[in-house]
Amino acid sequence: MKKRIDYLSNKQNKYSIRRFTVGTTSVIVGATILFGIGNHQAQASEQSNDTTQSSKNNASADSEKNNMIETPQLNTTANDTSDISANTNSANVDSTTKPMSTQTSNTTTTEPASTNETPQPTAIKNQATAAKMQDQTVPQEANSQVDNKTTNDANSIATNSELKNSQTLDLPQSSPQTISNAQGTSKPSVRTRAVRSLAVAEPVVNAADAKGTNVNDKVTASNFKLEKTTFDPNQSGNTFMAANFTVTDKVKSGDYFTAKLPDSLTGNGDVDYSNSNNTMPIADIKSTNGDVVAKATYDILTKTYTFVFTDYVNNKENINGQFSLPLFTDRAKAPKSGTYDANINIADEMFNNKITYNYSSPIAGIDKPNGANISSQIIGVDTASGQNTYKQTVFVNPKQRVLGNTWVYIKGYQDKIEESSGKVSATDTKLRIFEVNDTSKLSDSYYADPNDSNLKEVTDQFKNRIYYEHPNVASIKFGDITKTYVVLVEGHYDNTGKNLKTQVIQENVDPVTNRDYSIFGWNNENVVRYGGGSADGDSAVNPKDPTPGPPVDPEPSPDPEPEPTPDPEPSPDPEPEPSPDPDPDSDSDSDSGSDSDSGSDSDSESDSDSDSDSDSDSDSDSESDSDSESDSESDSDSDSDSDSDSDSDSDSDSDSDSDSDSDSDSDSDSDSDSDSDSDSDSDSDSDSDSDSDSDSDSDSDSDSDSDSDSDSDSDSDSDSDSDSDSDSDSDSDSDSDSDSDSDSDSDSDSDSDSDSDSDSDSDSDSDSDSDSDSDSDSDSDSDSDSDSDSDSDSDSDSDSDSDSRVTPPNNEQKAPSNPKGEVNHSNKVSKQHKTDALPETGDKSENTNATLFGAMMALLGSLLLFRKRKQDHKEKA
C-alpha cells in the first residue's frame, strides 16, 4: 500500500515553525525585559540628576518660597547649647542709590505668653539723594516700643551716613506699599517679618538635690497632653506638656521621680546653661497652702527632669499633683522642618507623640537679582551664670546671589541703643565667619556646627575687614560676593534688665553697574517661658486620733488626646502548595487493536480525568456483522494513575483494513515527552490512514520512553511534540505482534467516537500497538478526540471480539485490581450483564469448552497469519 510521505514532512515543517515561533517569542520577551529595565535605569538616573539640579537651582534661585517640610535629619554633633524660641523681626530697605541717611520702620508684637504674629509685607518711601557707596553707613534704630501686649507698635531701622541728614523710611506693617525713589526708576518691593518677643526673666528656684530613692515605681502619671503638636520655633513657637501624677505608696523627703524628653525636644529652649553645670531650675510644685511639695530641675545634657519631694510628704498619703512645663525644639537634633518622634517618659511610663516643626525659612531678602538678603537668630542666651553671654547665627547672602560692594552690620540694638541690653564691641564680641559649600544643606533651625564639612572657616580673611567704628555696631566688609556665608556671633549683654535686642543689616549694589543699591534688615529678640505645678496630699491617718490634713485642691485634668489605633497589618496570602507531579510511568500496553468490526458506537466517553484504573474490559462481544449497537459508553471517570492494565486481548479476527482516520486529536497536553521509540516495524500495510494527528503538545518532559515496539507500519506520524518533562518512563514494550490478519472484511463503521476527555496530566504513552494489519477498510472514523489531557491512559480496550458473542460466566469474570479503593465500573457492567443474560438452556461446560477452544485456535491462527504477512512485508521492503 502507498505510504503518505508528505505527512512526515508536513509535521517536520510544523515543528520547525513552532520552534521558530518559540525562538521569536524568546527574542521579543528578552528585548522587552532588556529595554524595559534599561529605561527604568535611565529614569532613575534622570531623576537623580533632576534632584541634584533642583537642589542647585533652589540654592541659587531668588524665590523665597522655601517652605517644604523635609525629612528629619538628626545632627549628632555634640552641642549642648540649649534652645529657646527666639523671635525675629525683619525689615528690608531697597533703593537705587545709597542715601546719606535712611530709616526703616517695622512692627513688632511683644507678648509674654503665647501669641504669634504673621509676617506682613511693608514698603519704603525713599527720598534720599545719591551718595557714594564707599561712605560706610551704619543702619541704626530710630525709635522702638515693646509693650508686652498683643498689639503691634512701630519699630524702625535707621541708616546713617556719618549720622547726618537722616531721612525717614516709613515701614507701616498693616499694608503693602511701594518705594518712592526721587532719583531712581525702579520700585522694588520690601518685606518685613514680624515676630513677637519677650523679655528675659530671672531664674525661679535653685536646683534641687536628689539624695533619696528613685520612686518611679510608686508614681503613676495620667492625663498627659501636649498643648499643640505643630509650631514654628523661629517665630518663638513652643508647646507645653501637662500631666497629673499620683503617689501610690508612702514616700519620704529626698525621694524623687523623673521625666525624660526625646531628642527632638528640649526644656530650656534657647537659654544657655552650659556655664551653670548644664542644670536648669524649674518652678516648685506647691500645695494649695503654698507649701513646697517638690523641687524640680532639668538636666540639659540628659534632657531629664527630676522632681525631689520635700519633708511635706513625710506624713502624707494619697499625694496627687500636676505640672505644666514648656517644651522647645532642639535646633541641633531637629535641624529641618518636618515631623519628629516626641515620646516622653514620665515615671518610667512612655507617652508616645509626634511633633511637627514648621520653621520659617532662613532664606529671605529682596526679590530681585541683586537684592540684599540676610537673616539671623539668637540661639542661646546665658541667663543663669552671671556671665551674660549670648550666641547668634547670621546667614549672609543665603540666596547665593552675585552682589557687589556688600556690607553687613551686626548691631546690639534695634531702634535705640538705650533700649537694649546688647553689647557689641571689639572686646565684647567674637565673630567667626564660614563660607558655605552647599547652601541647600543649611539648616532651617539656624543651627550651624563649626565642625561641619559643609562649612569652611574664612575668619582670617576678614581680619582687616571688621570694624567697630560706631557704637554697638560691628561692620563687616564682604565686598563682591557670589557665595553664602555663616557668621557665628558670641556676644554679651549688660545687667540693666532690658530686653536683649539685636539687628543685622546687609547692603550692596549691582556689581555690573555699581548702582541699584539694596538694603535688607532683620531683628531678633529672645523669649523665656517658665512652667510650674501644684500638688496636695492627705495626712497620715491615726485610727485613734485622726488628724485631718489640708483639703486637696482639685485640678481640672486636661482631656488626653486619643491615641491613634494602629492599622492591622495585612496577613500575607498563603502561597499555594504545588500539586505533585504524577508519576506517569504508565506501562499502558494500550493495544488498541480495536478491530471494532461492529457498529459498536462505543462512545466510550471515558473522561479519564484521574487515576482510575480504567480497566474497562468492556468486552463488547459484538459479532462482527452484527450491528450490535453496544453503546458501551463506559463513562469511566477513571480518575486513576491510569494503571490501565487493559488486558485487551484484541483477537479481532477482523481484517480491519481500518482506514481509521483516527484523528485522535488527543491534545494530550500531558506534558508527556513521549519519545515513543515506537519501532513500529510492523510491515503491516495497515494503510490505516490513521491520520493520528495526535498533536498532543504534551509539553510535559515525561520521558515516556515508551519503547513500544509496536511493529505497526501504520504511518501514524504522531508528531506529538510531546515535550512533556513528566518522566513517564512508560517502557511499555508492547511488542504485541498480534498478527491480527483477520481478513474479516468487517466494514464496520464503528464510529467509536470515544471522546474520552481524559483531561488530566495524562502521560498518554498510548503505546497503541496499533498493529492494525487489518485490511479492514472499515472507514471507522474513530474521531477519538480523546483530549487525553490527563494521566488516565484510558485504555478503553473494547475487546470487540467479534464473531465470538461469548458471554463469560459470572464466576469467571476477573475483577481488575483496584489498589486505591475506587469504584470499579467493570464490576458494575458484569453485574448488569449477569442480570440481563438470557436463560441458560444448554450444557454450560460444553459450550464454554468449545468456545475457549475455538478462541484459542482463532488466536493462534491470527498470530501465525500476522507474522507471515509481516515477514512478507519485510521481504518486499
From Swiss-Prot:
A motif (YSIRK-G/S signaling motif) lies at residues 15-26. The Asp/Ser-rich domain functions as a stalk to allow the ligand binding domain to be displayed in a functional form on the cell surface. The keyword S-adenosyl-L-methionine does not apply. Residues 556-801 have a biased composition (Acidic residues). It comes from Staphylococcus aureus (strain NCTC 8325 / PS 47). It is a peptidoglycan-anchor. Residues 842-877 form a propeptide. Residues 44-61, 68-95, 120-189, 805-816 have a biased composition (Polar residues). The record marks 197-200 as: Cleavage. It comes from the Bacteria. This is Clumping factor B. One of its GO terms (biological process) is cell adhesion. Disulfide bonds: none annotated. GO terms for cellular component: extracellular region. Cell surface-associated protein implicated in virulence by promoting bacterial attachment to both alpha- and beta-chains of human fibrinogen and inducing the formation of bacterial clumps. Partly responsible for mediating bacterial attachment to the highly keratinized squamous epithelial cells from the nasal cavity via an interaction with cytokeratin K10 (K10). Also promotes bacterial attachment to cultured keratinocytes, possibly through an interaction with cytokeratin K10. Binds mouse cytokeratin K10. Activates human platelet aggregation. Residues 833-846 have a biased composition (Basic and acidic residues). A motif (LPXTG sorting signal) lies at residues 838-842. The gene is clfB. Residues 1-44 form the signal peptide. SUPFAM superfamilies: Bacterial adhesins. Residues 545-555 have a biased composition (Pro residues). Residues 44-192, 530-849 are annotated as: Disordered. Keywords: Cell wall, Peptidoglycan-anchor, Secreted, Signal, Virulence.
